[in-house]
A protein has these predicted regions:
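Interfacial helix-start motif at the membrane-water boundary
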Residues: 43-66
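Alpha-helical transmembrane segments and their helix-start/interface "positive-inside/aromatic belt" motifs
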Residues: 1-16, 156-160
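Juxtamembrane "helix-exit" motif on the non-cytosolic side of transmembrane helices
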Residues: 78, 107-115, 172-182
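Alpha-helical transmembrane segments of multi-pass membrane proteins
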Residues: 13-35
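Membrane-proximal helix-loop-helix units in multi-pass membrane proteins
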Residues: 98-152
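Terminal transmembrane helical module of multi-pass membrane proteins
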Residues: 139-221
Length: 221
């Protein structure tokens, strides 16, 4: 497994694995409603990871995942080093900003609603979804152009499908916005959008197979 593959896999497993484990623990402890949230929308992601052991798992796992998101964007920039430098900088800036927004929004979650800084959480979560969509879109455009120049992208069709679905949900459902209280429809969109973003991170597993990155390359030197 190359360094890049490890980052792609860890980004997906830490994020989606944490959410899955949190939900399992939350339902077992009775702090989260039991359903298929992807279709029923009985709960949002935030409220599955606030109380009890589920809260500790969620905060620890998602904060760790955010750190890997940041590294993922660094690796992606190195991989697309032949692309426009300004576009790469904008892509990385918004990707990292989105990850930091999620980190801040997760860090302020506390077991009791009254103790949680909801303003920080809501802004951080919305920054993640909207900033990440913008960064991933730039990333896809750069990959599309690089591929036309002969750049090999094994996951291109998969990435195309994910970007298309993400934009369909964003436009068709008036964007992905997180609030303290959300409708069933918004909750469903939140679950699916989170999954598709995670899968986009994972898709780089196939692109970065066999690619080894040195410390100097990863830092852009």
């Amino acid at each position: 497994m190359s360094f890049g593959q490890f980052i792609a896999l860890a980004s997906f497993v830490l994020s989606m694995g944490t959410i899955a484990l949190t939900y399992a623990v939350g339902t077992a402890e009775g702090s989260a409603a039991l359903c298929n949230p992807f279709f029923d929308g009985c709960t949002d992601i935030t409220h599955t990871g606030m109380k009890g052991d589920a809260g500790f798992i969620f905060r620890g796992g998602m904060i760790a995942a955010c750190s890997f998101f940041v590294i993922w964007w660094m690796v992606m920039r190195v991989w697309l080093a032949g692309s426009n430098r300004i576009a790469l900088s904008v892509m990385q800036f918004f990707g990292v900003l989105a990850a930091l927004g999620l980190l801040a929004g997760t860090a302020v979650l506390l077991p009791e609603k009254a103790d949680t800084h909801w303003g920080v959480h809501v802004r951080g979560a919305n920054l993640f979804f909207q900033g990440m969509l913008f960064a991933l879109t730039i990333n896809y455009v750069l990959i599309f152009r690089a591929r036309k120049r002969g750049f090999v992208v094994p996951s291109f069709i998969f990435k195309t499908s994910l970007i298309a679905v993400l934009w369909f949900m964003f436009i068709g459902f008036a964007g992905v916005t997180v609030g303290v209280e959300m409708s069933h429809g918004k909750r469903i969109i939140e679950w699916w959008t989170t999954l598709f973003i995670g899968l986009y991170f994972l898709s780089s597993w196939w692109d970065w197979k066999g690619i080894q990155l040195s410390v100097n390359e990863a830092s852009g030197k």
